Amino acid sequence: AEGDGSVDTP
């Protein structure tokens, strides 16, 4: 996700 601080993207 975007901007959620997950492992996917920052």
From Swiss-Prot:
Biotechnology annotation for this entry: This enzyme is capable of clotting milk and thus can be used for cheese production.
GO MF annotation list: aspartic-type endopeptidase activity
Question: Catalysed reaction(s)?
Answer: Hydrolysis of proteins, favoring hydrophobic residues at P1 and P1'. Clots milk. Does not accept Lys at P1, and hence does not activate trypsinogen
Q: Which UniProt keywords apply?
A: Aspartyl protease, Hydrolase, Protease
Q: What class of enzyme is it?
A: hydrolase
Q: Which GO terms describe its biological process?
A: proteolysis
> Per the UniProt record, which EC number(s) apply here?
3.4.23.23
Similarity field: Belongs to the peptidase A1 family.
Record-given protein name: Mucorpepsin
- Give the organism the record lists: Mucor thermohyalospora
